[in-house]
Amino acid sequence: MACSVHLVLFLTILLSLAETPESAPAHRGRGGWTLNSAGYLLGPVLPVSSKADQGRKRDSALEILDLWKIIDGLPYSHSPRMTKRTMGETFVKANTGDMHILDKNVPKEEATLDSES
């Protein structure tokens, strides 16, 4: 009888220890580095608190997010207008950079009009 009492007491202590918060796996939220669908490496999600006493931490977290956007070139690394070129800008000779000296491989306007008809 004394052995079974000790066994029950021992099992009760083990079960009470197994239910402590320290032994349970804690969900720490989304963290770590991951890839998005385009294959870009994304950093961990920074928790931004709205408490007044953590305003400085919130500001530094926002600064880090701004730096990530600058590094990744988000939302655009340059304005969309800069990517659109005229035909002349596209075929300017690279070594001169002069708009009036075109590359020899550029088809003449007459040749393109003749091929369309």
Curated annotation (Swiss-Prot):
Molecular-function GO terms, alphabetical = hormone activity; signaling receptor binding
Query: Any transmembrane segments, and where?
Result: none
Main subcellular localization, coarse class? secreted
Propeptide ranges are 86-117
GO terms in the biological process aspect are: behavioral response to starvation; defense response to bacterium; neuropeptide signaling pathway; regulation of appetite; response to insulin
Which tissues does the record link to its expression? Answer: Isoform 2 is found in brain, thymus and skin. Isoform 2 is found in the skin, in pericytes covering microvascular arterioles and venules on their abluminal surfaces. In larger vessels, isoform 2 is expressed in layers of smooth muscle cells. Isoform 2 is not detected in endothelial cells.
Domain of life where this protein originates: Eukaryota
In terms of Pfam families, this protein maps to: Galanin
Could you say which residues form the signal peptide? 1-23
As for subcellular location, the record says:
Secreted
Q: Which UniProt keywords apply?
A: Antibiotic, Antimicrobial, Cleavage on pair of basic residues, Hormone, Neuropeptide, Secreted, Signal
Quote a single Gene Ontology cellular component term. Answer: extracellular region
Q: Which family does it belong to?
A: Belongs to the galanin family.
Q: What is this protein called?
A: Galanin-like peptide
Q: What is the originating organism of this protein?
A: Mus musculus (Mouse)
Designated gene of the protein: Galp
